[in-house]
């Protein structure tokens, strides 16, 4: 049983490192240097691709825990926020520019989805709840 917990923590930390690297690469290469040179539509595509990459990494790693509520929450939050981003993005593509306030909301949602914050929070909840359940059993 001790070996299983070590492997779960190792897998979780590895996922956190990969998400942090993706997050850093986005900010270094696409947010600061590359993005000013491309059109608005390609910015949307780049942002969407990075959200999907982080979503895929999180899904792959969190699936290893075999905790149904955690995967449901992960999928639910991503479906809701990605849907909101898609609606805002499609409106921006087809009806012209969106207001700065809506753009700030979209940027905040995007930042939340690609940052390691959600992944970390879910991991902390899992390890705390798992630890509490283990201590109740003993």
Predicted regions and their residues:
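Non-cytosolic membrane-interface motifs at loop->transmembrane helix junctions
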Residues: 35-44, 100-113
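Loop-to-helix transition at the N-terminal end of transmembrane alpha-helices
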Residues: 35-52, 72-78
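Alpha-helical transmembrane segments of multi-pass membrane proteins
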Residues: 16-31, 88
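Membrane-interface helix-boundary motifs at transmembrane edges
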Residues: 2-7, 61-74, 132-137
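Alpha-helical transmembrane segments
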Residues: 8-23, 78, 82, 123-124
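Hydrophobic transmembrane alpha-helices of multi-pass, membrane-embedded glycosylation machinery
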Residues: 89-90, 95, 122-129
């Amino acid at each position: 049983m001790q070996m299983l917990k070590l492997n779960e923590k190792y897998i979780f930390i590895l996922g956190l490192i990969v998400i942090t690297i993706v997050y850093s690469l986005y900010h270094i290469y696409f947010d600061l240097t590359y993005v000013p040179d491309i059109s608005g539509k390609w910015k949307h595509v780049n942002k969407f691709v990075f959200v999907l990459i982080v979503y895929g990494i999180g899904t792959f790693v969190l699936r290893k825990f075999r905790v149904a509520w955690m995967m449901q929450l992960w999928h639910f939050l991503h479906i809701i926020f990605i849907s909101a981003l898609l609606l805002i993005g499609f409106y921006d593509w087809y009806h012209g520019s969106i207001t700065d306030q809506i753009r700030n909301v979209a940027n905040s949602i995007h930042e939340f989805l690609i940052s390691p914050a959600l992944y970390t929070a879910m991991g902390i909840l899992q390890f705390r709840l798992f630890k509490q359940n283990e201590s109740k059993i003993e």
